[in-house]
Amino acid sequence: MFEELGVRLAQPEEVHEIMAEALRACSENGFANASQIKVLEQVWCGLNLDNGLIGVIGEPGKLEGGILLRITDVWYSDDKVLEERAIFIPPEYRGVKGGRARRLCEFAKQAAKAMEMPLLIGVLSNHRTEAKVRLY
């Protein structure tokens, strides 16, 4: 379903690589201190399709980017939504031809449509915010 975007579902055996990039993204955002346990809980659920999923670009061991999506509800409703928790692109792939972040956003849109859920996606950062705003 997502092959045309060059995005695939991440597998549980990729947990260490995904964690490294997710923690880097948390550190770069600098919004709050990251808890490795909380990040791992989110990542593990996504890797095992337990109320979430992780789309990645690249082969195992050569991750070029990823997006963590979780199924949750918004604070005022019992309706389920697909929520973006993080998009991460390793520094060596940022600004390089290939539109990785845009492809991951499109993956999120297609996943939400396939799941018949609204998509909650946006910007939470105090670092590189201008580039993220242009992305959306």
Segments predicted by a language model, with ranges:
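Short amphipathic alpha-helix that is part of the acyltransferase structural core
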Residues: 1-37
